[in-house]
């Protein structure tokens, strides 16, 4: 067992780091710590991978629950309730800022439906629709390839970490793959309806999705470990929060706001399969880079993101960089671009999030028409799907990963969900095939819960 000194730390402080043995994968360790520290105790938690580190937020010291008709802040067994109206961004932002007066980071998720208010479509939501869950954790553990750092954790939890290192991370059971080609939601027919509406001039693009029910309960931490080995996400996450379990491998950022005010979003649009051998991957890439439908889809998405960035950025700072390069994400490859700007002096991170949310690559163009079409044509409320998993910091930073390529569990049901961007040139069969390609990011790697 690794030997280090042990000390009790207060919330926000840190204890001496623990070296990570070279034979232990940091993603495996972080997921196993989620099991040992939270799953077995029935605690809520969120694991978030960003830039070579895995941040595990465990236990709830305070919780912000934003619904379509009420804001609740729960702390020390006391619930403060507030009815609200208007935009959800300022309401959520104010609640977040209050908690960040006492701690340095909060974690949570934001539902797709958070974004309908910007377009005046909130009357379409059912009463009590969940919009966001954000919490102040009791403890936080950061795992990198070199070390483990504990923040606000007790001596007992440090001992648990040392125990996992001493025992080693357990092996994984075999996966139980699910068939991605079933289509009980008549996805092809919905695509055809959208193409007809686009041809009639109602909007230019919409992302329609379909659900794939999983016929068994999923072991989410084990699935995270196995699928992470087969994916190359920009962010990944594992969570049990607000009545939802989820595991996912985010292909893109909805928004990242740095402490110095730089805002970044990374729209991915245009898709082909990946991971089918070097020759097939090269052929698919060549087709992706030359296909007029995919190029048009990407270009109009980037233009929309640039316009949104300009709304909240200092004049002249909104720019596109790394335009239309191929980015590999597990079982698929995409055309991707980076859009950035410097946050205007009259705006804050929630203004940036509201301007960019929901992601253009998960909604439509124009967004108002795309979101309205989704509420009519898509397969039920989206919830966390195409929303965001977020990390918010006291220094003004925000990191919001687009919630795609994920598995979900709620009310005893488990499912995957994937979509495709529909434009006038779309064909139902190809868009269905694209959803199959995206579902294959996770479908082969599901491990059943024992």
UniProtKB/Swiss-Prot annotation:
Keywords: Isomerase, Lyase, Magnesium, Metal-binding. Its EC number is 5.4.99.5, 4.2.99.21, 5.4.4.2. One of its GO terms (biological process) is L-tryptophan biosynthetic process. GO terms for molecular function: chorismate mutase activity; isochorismate pyruvate lyase activity; isochorismate synthase activity; magnesium ion binding; oxo-acid-lyase activity. It comes from the Bacteria. The active site is at residue 252. Belongs to the anthranilate synthase component I family. Salicylate synthase subfamily. This is Salicylate synthase. It comes from Mycolicibacterium paratuberculosis (strain ATCC BAA-968 / K-10). The gene is mbtI.
């Amino acid at each position: 067992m690794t030997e280090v000194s042990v000390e009790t730390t207060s919330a926000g402080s840190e204890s001496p780091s623990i070296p990570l043995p070279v034979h232990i994968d940091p993603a495996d360790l972080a997921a196993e710590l989620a099991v040992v520290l939270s799953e077995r105790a029935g605690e809520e938690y969120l694991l978030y991978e960003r830039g070579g580190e895995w941040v595990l937020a465990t236990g709830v010291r305070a919780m912000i629950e934003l619904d379509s008709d009420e804001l609740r802040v729960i702390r020390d067994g006391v619930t403060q309730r507030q009815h609200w109206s208007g935009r959800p961004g300022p309401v959520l932002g104010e609640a977040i800022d209050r908690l960040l007066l006492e701690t340095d980071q909060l974690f949570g998720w934001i539902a797709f439906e958070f974004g309908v208010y910007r377009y005046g479509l909130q009357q379409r939501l059912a009463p009590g629709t969940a919009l966001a869950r954000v919490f102040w954790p009791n403890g936080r553990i950061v795992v990198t390839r070199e070390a483990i750092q504990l923040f606000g954790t007790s001596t007992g939890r440090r001992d648990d970490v040392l125990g996992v290192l001493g025992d080693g991370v357990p092996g994984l059971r075999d996966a139980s793959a699910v068939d991605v080609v079933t289509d009980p939601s008549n996805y092809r027919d919905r695509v055809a309806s959208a193409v007809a509406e686009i041809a009639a001039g109602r909007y230019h693009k919409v992302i329609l999705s379909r659900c794939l029910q999983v016929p068994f309960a999923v072991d989410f931490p084990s699935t995270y470990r196995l699928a992470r080995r087969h994916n190359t996400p920009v962010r990944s996450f594992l969570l049990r929060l607000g009545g939802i379990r989820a595991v996912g491998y985010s292909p893109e950022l909805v928004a990242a706001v740095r402490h110095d005010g730089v805002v970044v979003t990374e729209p991915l649009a245009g898709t082909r399969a990946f991971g089918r051998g070097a020759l097939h991957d090269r052929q698919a890439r060549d087709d992706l880079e030359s296909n007029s439908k995919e190029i048009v889809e990407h270009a109009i998405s980037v233009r929309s993101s640039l316009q949104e960035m300009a709304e909240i950025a200092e004049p002249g700072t909104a720019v596109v960089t790394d335009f239309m390069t191929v980015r590999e994400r597990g079982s698929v490859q995409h055309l991707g671009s980076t859009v950035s700007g410097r946050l205007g002096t009259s705006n804050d991170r929630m203004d940036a999030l509201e301007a960019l949310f929901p992601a253009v690559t998960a909604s439509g163009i124009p967004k108002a028409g795309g979101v309205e079409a989704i509420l009519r044509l898509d397969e039920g409320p989206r919830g966390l799907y195409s929303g965001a998993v977020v990390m918010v910091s006291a220094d003004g930073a925000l990191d919001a990963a687009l919630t795609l390529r994920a598995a979900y569990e709620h009310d005893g049901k488990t499912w995957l969900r994937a979509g495709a961007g529909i434009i006038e040139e779309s064909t139902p069969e190809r868009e269905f095939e694209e959803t199959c390609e995206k579902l294959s990011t996770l479908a082969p790697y599901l491990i059943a819960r024992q």
